[in-house]
């Protein structure tokens, strides 16, 4: 094994473990017919998106930057949820996401108009 740098923090991803987890996720999908989305807030290592996209159906994004990341690097379905959608940024949100979650009646009104 190659020596790992110890002078700075880093993430070490184990492809075998990711693949094993994806196999379990596929079993759940096959047994239930459900759709499984990845929350970019929890895991946004776009370098492994091609591997994840073989099993996962898409992503959820809670910021415009996450929505853009999903659109650019993760094929499939994209869902957005945010405490606040700004009128200025919302047209860009619609370029990146197919559906949106509203967190208040005011957001429902905003999203419908």
Q: What role is predicted for each listed range?
A:
Residues 21-31, 48, 69:
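A short, N-terminal amphipathic alpha-helix
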Residues 10, 34-113:
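Active-site-proximal beta-alpha core segment in soluble small-molecule metabolic enzymes
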């Amino acid at each position: 094994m190659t020596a790992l740098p110890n002078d700075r923090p880093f993430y070490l991803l184990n492809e075998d473990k990711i693949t094993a987890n994806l196999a379990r996720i596929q079993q759940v999908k096959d047994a239930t017919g459900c759709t499984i989305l990845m929350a970019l807030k929890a895991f946004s290592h776009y370098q492994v998106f091609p591997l994840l996209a073989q099993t996962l159906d898409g992503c959820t994004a809670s910021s415009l930057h996450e929505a853009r990341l999903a659109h650019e690097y993760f094929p499939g379905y994209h869902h957005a949820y945010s405490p606040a959608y700004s009128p200025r940024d919302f047209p860009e949100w619609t370029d990146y996401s197919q559906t949106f979650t509203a967190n208040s009646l005011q957001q429902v009104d905003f999203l419908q108009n």
